[in-house]
Regions:
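General beta-strand structural signal in soluble alpha/beta enzymes
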Residues: 48, 120-125, 173-175
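Rossmann-fold NAD(P)-binding glycine/threonine-rich loop
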Residues: 82, 90-131, 135-139
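NAD(P)+-binding Rossmann beta1-loop-alpha1 motif at the extreme N-terminus of oxidoreductases
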Residues: 1-44
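Active-site-lining helix/loop region of Rossmann-like oxidoreductase modules
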Residues: 143-244
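Rossmann-like adenosine-cofactor binding region
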Residues: 68-79, 92-99, 104-106, 223-227, ...
């Protein structure tokens, strides 16, 4: 597939490396320019391009950008064909993104992103730490393979996203409509807890919007309690412990 990744940070860089390594034709763009794309992001064959070129003639576009800024790309996406699959990886943290009243009033995070962008999106890759994504992807069929939820309103676009999740080394789970994607947002039981395909459905079902938002908003204090240099394993355990 011809894929563009917009955003060359930890998540975007991981996806560019893994998807190009899996044989896809991958381009990477960053709002700061091509020079902002680190050489290691391109080490498996991805190419750095200008942002204006990132959405041209693509089968899929992955948004690996901060939550709440998708509206800045609305003009860029205005001419993108409807059949191009657009995937959103972002997460809403008020202490990082600023308080967004629409979300606080109940608009689901990726529904908000879709509205800003002016087109449908599929939610994927948001519910795993960047380090989990970088180091723990394994071939299909491997016992204990970590699962990633995928939510969206089109069965076909979800199938595309789920195939790409599999290509990055994780089992994909159909988590329902985009309106249900709040269940995989911070800090629900399914968020960054490294669950298998058998474990993930129950975690999504156990999500509680009020409780999970309260846990999310306490994250600065929770991280501080982990000390100066927490490991990814420490973070996963912290997330799991929040729901025991």
């Amino acid at each position: 597939m011809k894929i563009s990744v917009i955003g060359a940070g930890a998540i975007g860089g991981n996806l560019a490396r893994k998807l190009s390594g899996a044989g896809h034709d991958v381009e990477v763009a960053d709002a700061r320019g091509r020079e902002a794309v680190a050489p290691e992001v391109l080490e498996t064959g991805a190419r750095a391009v200008a942002l204006d070129d990132a959405v041209k003639d693509k089968d899929a576009v992955i948004l690996a950008i901060p939550f709440g800024v998708a509206g800045q790309l609305a003009d860029l996406f205005a001419s993108v064909p409807a059949e191009t699959v657009v995937m959103d990886t972002s997460n809403y943290y008020p202490h990082l993104n600023g308080r967004i009243e629409a979300v606080e009033d109940g608009v689901v995070e990726s529904v908000y992103t879709s509205e800003l962008l002016g087109r449908p999106v599929v939610k994927a890759w948001n519910a795993a730490l960047s380090e989990t994504q970088r180091t723990k992807g394994v071939p299909a069929g491997t016992p204990g393979r970590i699962a990633i939820p995928v939510a969206g309103d089109s069965e076909e676009t979800k199938r595309v996203a789920m195939r790409l999740v599999d290509d990055t080394g994780f089992d994909a789970y159909d988590a329902g409509a985009l309106a249900d994607s709040w269940r995989q947002q911070p800090m629900g039981p399914a968020y960054c807890t490294e669950l298998t395909l058998d474990e993930l459905p129950a975690a999504l079902a156990a999500a509680d919007r009020v409780k999970d938002a309260a846990v999310r908003d306490s994250m600065p204090e929770r991280f501080a309690a982990l000390g100066a240099n927490p490991t990814p394993e420490d973070v996963v355990e912290m997330n799991r412990a929040a729901h025991r």
